[in-house]
Amino acid sequence: MALNAFIGNYQHSIDTKGRLFLPAKQRSYVGEKVYMTRGLDDCIFLFYEEGWNAFVESLMSLPTSKSRTALRFFSGNAALSDVDGQGRITIPQSLRKITGIEKDVTVVGALNRIEIWDTERWDSFNLQTDSSAVSELLEEVGF
C-alpha cells in the first residue's frame, strides 16, 4: 500500500444494521476484510490486514510494563469485518457505543489507516485544532 492511500475525508451514514459503505478510493486498498478497534479521540481505527499486523507488531515491541494498557485498549476492543460485495463493513455495536458513533460519520484517511468519526466530533476536532498547534507539536518531536 502506498503511504498516501488513505487520505481525505468523506461523509457517510451507518445503517440500522451497523453497516458502513467504505469510500471507493479507500476500498481498493483494504481487500476483503478489515480490522477495526477503538481509536484515540473516540474514533474507530480501521486497518487492512497488512496494516493491522504492522500496528500490532509496533505495539508488541513496546516495553511490556508500558504496553499492557495499550495492548488491552486496542486488542480488547478489536473486531474483524468482511467487506461485502457492495463495499460495506459492519461495525459492531460495542465499538459504536464506546465511541459514541450512531449514524452520521466522517471517514478520515490517516495515511496508514482509516479513522471513522462521529461527524459532529470530527467537525469539533477540526475547529479546535489550528495549524499553529500542529506546528508546535511537530517541533516538539523534531519534525
Predicted feature residues:
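Short hydrophobic beta-strand that contains or immediately precedes a catalytic carboxylate
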Residues: 22
